[in-house]
A protein has these predicted regions:
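Acidic/histidine-rich catalytic neighborhood of metal-dependent amide-processing enzymes
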Residues: 139, 166, 177-269, 299
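Catalytic-core environment of secreted peptidases
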Residues: 33-49, 71, 75, 141-206, ...
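Structural recognition of the beta-strand scaffold that forms the well-ordered cores
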Residues: 144-146, 155-159, 210-213, 238-245, ...
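Active-site-adjacent substrate-binding region
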Residues: 252-364
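A non-catalytic alpha/beta surface segment that caps or lines the substrate-entry region
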Residues: 45-48, 52-146
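Extracytoplasmic/secreted proteins, especially bacterial periplasmic and envelope-associated proteins
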Residues: 26, 34, 38-45, 59-71, ...
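Solvent-exposed loop/turn segments at secondary-structure junctions
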Residues: 52-53, 89-91, 149-152, 162-166, ...
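Second-shell loop/turn segments in exported
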Residues: 25-33, 49-60, 129-134, 175-186, ...
Length: 364
């Protein structure tokens, strides 16, 4: 069940809010109008207002949704785009299928039923299926900011989930009583998306853009499952998508290569041409960060649901192979103080370049 509520439609083709940059240098000037201080304040405010957790069914979850809506209206004061609040009933049958299929593919037949790994993942699978059933009365809410371009038929999509989940690393069970600030997971992605709205709302674009704040990521990616299905039904000509997940974790201490600024973009071989263009645009804006191209797929974020519906794209994230710190992942330690603020801001600049370069066909 989907209920679309259009809160504001103020886009008119004859309105001009600012010049459209025609070069990378001009683009950088516009991108830098959002400061590092602005970006970090979004994370601090979101974590504070939604404390102790943004998990489905808890008060902080609804507060996070309202925070995002209020922030969009504040950044797009002139209504250059429209806000679509897409409320949906979670497809718990799909959640059960998702977890069972994952277990069947990776565990069943590969381990004896008495093996500890089999037992661990069997319990997890059963538990998550039960969790989906337990939470099914809580509607999900995807928030979409859409701004039309000169060629409105072509659409670029940027996504980031805003809910959190806290899992015990040993039992893999959800601990709802534990605080889960979710600064990196995924207030970082939300903050970059809101900053992109701040940027894009003031520039005339060649193509339409959707910036999407996804719900229900923590349970079978049901928010992106719903969004991707609706996007497919719409018949839009989608250029591709950028999924933003955990952009603030970057250390030299834990990094196997002892470097910072080495982030990753995960995609499939068929996404390479689209992702390569994004990387080219982004790298023209800043050299303080690099998103290494990794055509290995990615199973830990909402990109999988968009891939299921045939869309091209990838997930921009931290370096999961060389600088993944489990101490902060889905734990109470995931606080704003643990983030690398310089890397996060550089990620915003880079992604701003990737997005604007695509939407404006920048070549020089």
């Amino acid at each position: 069940v989907s209920k679309l509520i259009i809160l504001a439609i103020f886009s008119f083709s004859f309105q001009v809010y600012s010049r459209a940059p025609g070069t990378y240098a001009q683009m950088r000037y516009d991108i830098d109008k959002v400061s590092q201080k602005n970006l970090i304040s979004i994370i601090n405010d979101l974590v504070k207002v939604s404390a102790p957790s943004r998990m489905i069914g808890l008060p902080g979850h609804d507060k996070a949704r309202d925070f995002i809506l209020d922030s969009i209206k504040a950044y797009d004061k002139k209504g250059a785009g429209k806000i679509i609040v897409d409320s949906f009933s979670p497809d718990v049958n799909e959640a059960e299928r998702f977890y069972q299929a994952d277990f069947n593919e990776k565990i069943e037949g590969k381990f004896s039923p008495t093996h500890p790994d089999y037992q661990k993942w069997f319990k997890f699978t059963t538990y998550m299926k039960q969790t989906a059933q337990r939470l099914k009365s809580f509607q999900g809410t995807n928030i979409i900011w859409e701004k039309s371009g000169l060629n409105a038929e072509k659409t670029l999509v940027i996504t980031a989930h805003y809910d959190t989940i806290s899992l015990d690393p040993n039992t893999l069970m959800i601990d709802e009583k534990k605080p889960m600030p979710g600064a990196n997971y995924n207030a970082s992605g939300v903050a970059v998306c809101l900053s992109l709205i701040n940027l894009l709302s003031k520039i005339d674009l060649n193509y339409t853009v959707q910036v999407v704040f996804l719900d229900w990521q923590g349970v079978a990616f049901l928010g992106s499952h719903h969004y991707a299905q609706e996007l497919k039904k719409s018949g839009k000509n989608v250029l591709g998508f950028l999924n933003l997940e955990m952009l603030g974790q970057d250390t030299s201490f834990f990094d196997k290569t002892k470097k910072t600024g080495n982030m990753s973009v995960y995609y499939r071989p068929q996404d390479e041409k689209f992702v390569q263009a994004l990387v080219h645009h982004g790298s023209q804006i800043t050299n303080k960060i690099a998103f290494q191209m990794k055509p290995m797929g990615f199973e830990n974020s909402d990109n999988i649901r968009l891939w299921e519906q045939g869309f091209l794209g990838g997930t921009f994230s931290q370096n999961w192979e060389e600088d993944f710190n489990p101490k902060f992942y889905q734990t109470p330690q995931d606080t704003p103080e643990t983030l690398n603020h310089q890397t996060l801001y550089s990620a915003y600049q880079y992604l701003g370049g990737a997005v604007l370069g695509t939407l404006l066909d920048i070549t020089k």
